[in-house]
A protein has these predicted regions:
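A conserved amphipathic terminal alpha-helix motif
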Residues: 110, 116-151
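Hydrophobic pocket/interface hotspot
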Residues: 25-30, 36, 59, 73, ...
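Short Pro/Gly-enriched beta-strand edge/turn motifs at strand-loop
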Residues: 41-43, 52-55, 79-85
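Hydrophobic-ligand binding "helix-grip"
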Residues: 37, 63-108, 116-118
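Hydrophobic residues positioned within well-ordered beta-strands of beta-sheet architectures
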Residues: 13-15, 57-59, 71, 97, ...
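Short, P/G- and charge-enriched loop/turn segments at secondary-structure junctions
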Residues: 1-5, 57-60, 86-87, 99
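C-terminal and inter-domain tail/linker signature
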Residues: 23, 59, 69-70, 111-112, ...
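Hydrophobic ligand-binding cavity/cleft-lining segments
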Residues: 1-51
């Protein structure tokens, strides 16, 4: 039974990167949701569902620290964005994230990773996790940029 008297904290993280590439090139990389060589400290990723893309796809990401995060795709808009929820593996009660892309007037692609999350951890732990998540997004997006622009 859940204790509804526990203090909860909600927060968000948002980071973006500009990539010199076509919409098609960036989407091709982002839409391969188990090919995550650009994801910071990712060890391996595999499908847990028969479905391999689109809403209802489930993946399991294993990290170098031994943690595993199960994610379910809940939105899929080709060449625009996808959203997912984390079911297990994070110190959170809820986590929803979207990775989106948009062509800018300069012809570059702006990739944005943003999330909303809720925790019942102590405020200090929650704030530390929020900072960690922002750094994780920044590093991963820089890896994505380097990966795309050098290939």
């Amino acid at each position: 039974m859940r204790n509804f008297d526990v203090e909860k904290h909600a927060g968000s993280a948002k980071r973006s990167v500009m990539i010199k590439a076509s919409v098609e090139t960036v989407w091709k990389k982002l839409s391969k949701i188990t090919k995550l060589g650009w994801l910071e400290e990712q060890k391996s990723t595999k499908f847990l569902s028969q479905k391999k893309h689109g809403v209802g796809t489930i993946r399991l990401i294993s990290f170098e620290d031994g943690s595993n995060v199960e994610e379910h795709i809940v939105e899929w808009s080709p060449k625009k964005c996808f959203s997912y929820i984390a079911i297990t593996g994070l110190p959170l009660l809820a986590y929803l994230a979207t990775i989106s892309m948009k062509k800018t007037s300069s012809g570059r692609i702006k990739v944005t990773w943003q999330s909303y999350f809720v925790s019942d951890k102590k405020k200090k732990e929650f704030l530390e996790f929020s900072k960690f998540l922002s750094r994780f997004y920044s590093k991963s997006l820089q890896n994505l940029k380097s990966d795309i622009e050098t290939n």
